[in-house]
Amino acid sequence: MIIVCASCGAKNRVPEEKLAVHPNCGQCHQALLPLEPIELNEQNFSNFISNSDLPVLIDLWAEWCGPCKMMAPHFAQVAKQNPYVVFAKIDTEANPRLSAAFNVRSIPTLVLMNKTTEVARISGALRTLELQQWLDQQLQQQQGN
């Protein structure tokens, strides 16, 4: 399994059975499975998304968005509970090309990616339990496919 380091962008080959021991990057020695959302931008998005074998849940948000700010701690809480999903945030104001590529119509918008394929999307602020239930449902559907 390939895991892209959120800190330095290096690709790391990690056997699936080693994921439970919280592996570190071979290049920068940072945790490969951070238990908090990472920041993606127009510079690191393509490398990260196309090379990560883990599902990536992206929160498309903006600084001025009240519901986005309300949802942020819930998104971070669910990230702590799901080490085998990468939680990422993209600031739509700072990254307008990514916002356009995702065809964002309202924020916050959550997009679940499997490599470069969008597998699910939901718009609107979610609380911890709602977000966890939605994510579980999407991951179960992916396992069934």
From Swiss-Prot:
GO function term, MF aspect, one: metal ion binding
Pfam families attached to this UniProt entry: Thioredoxin, Zn_ribbon_Thio2
Residues the entry annotates as binding heme: C25, C28, H29
The yes or no answer to whether the keyword Transmembrane is present is no
What the entry lists under SUPFAM superfamilies is as follows:
Thioredoxin-like
UniProt keywords, alphabetically: Disulfide bond, Electron transport, Heme, Iron, Metal-binding, Redox-active center, Transport
The chain positions of domain Thioredoxin read 29-140
One GO term describing the cellular component:
cytosol
Q: Which InterPro entries match?
A: Thio2_N (IPR049299), Thioredoxin (IPR005746), Thioredoxin-like_sf (IPR036249), Thioredoxin_CS (IPR017937), Thioredoxin_domain (IPR013766)
- Report the domain of life of the source organism: Bacteria
Cystine pairs: C65-C68
Give a short account of what the protein does.
Participates in various redox reactions through the reversible oxidation of its active center dithiol to a disulfide and catalyzes dithiol-disulfide exchange reactions.
> What protein family is recorded?
Belongs to the thioredoxin family.
Protein name in UniProt: Thioredoxin C-3
The top of its lineage is: Bacteria, Bacillati, Actinomycetota, Actinomycetes, Mycobacteriales
